[in-house]
Amino acid sequence: MICMCDVPRYADADMEEIRKMREAHTVLKHVDYEPKELYHGYTDKRLKIDLSSNSVEILDIPEEVKEKFTGGKGYCLRYLWDDTTPDTKWDSPENAITMSAGPIAGITQYAGTGKCLVCTISPMTDIPIDSNVGGYFGPFLKFSGFDVIELTGKAEEDVIIVIDGNKGTISIEKAPMEHLDSHVLGEELTAMYAEDENDRKNVAVVCSGSAAEHCNLSMLNFTFFDPKRNVVRLKQAGRGGIGRVFANKHIKALVCHFKGVKANLNHVYDISLLNKDGLKFHREVATLDNKQNAMRKSGTAYSLRTLSDYDILPTRNYKYGGTDRIDEMAP
């Protein structure tokens, strides 16, 4: 599930209130590191944070893991496997939330490279679940030096994890004053960790919101700042109740700041081939989207209509592949 909404700009950024919120933070852990430059889409580094002990580890990813699991969902599932046992439940401290963007993450000339995969053991099924989400967090994490992040353990109180890929810093901070609702929290943290108004586009926030305190089927919200509309927008990793696991670990938010995205920051193997295929892909999307998917106009919800038209929309427990009531469901 991927959906999107816009939220109003944070009250012309009441920066005095933001300053008070930040001053109320208690830094539980601070780590300086040297961000590794990408080579052919990889840094071969993973970031592992244990909230029970406030430990932060930067670990190597072996070549054989890269060859077999590639990145994205592969890395997420591999390191979820390493962190858990057959007896691990969704609310066990060792249950990990893993996030990874693939080797082409953030390539500006190829559509869809903002995607990030998220995995955990689901509170709905007690088995692994994955969900994908757009926005900027995946590329920012990659450009900050990490192919995958693992969040394990449980904090004693609500914390915010902050990664700054330009400064080379990682911190775990107790954050008592910020709002819990994602549409407000995203605005607050974007204003808090941006260097100025022009820097807001370089901040991505992951949060679960207040619903995750009450409901297993809760999502993770990923923010990004839209300069054209001058608003913070939200996308969701909506499957499997990952937000519930996030909140159960007492993570109020995960913030990543990175400034300096450019066309070939991950140094792909053959940029000329990528440019050629990217141009072809962009042309197809621009020409065919309005006729086939209407994603630009209507978003993910329109896919229900497409699935029903092709008789592959699960209906009445998969008894049918479509419905004549699709006008009530899809735009």
Please describe what each predicted stretch is:
Residues 2-132, 136-331:
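Intrinsically disordered, low-complexity segments enriched in small residues
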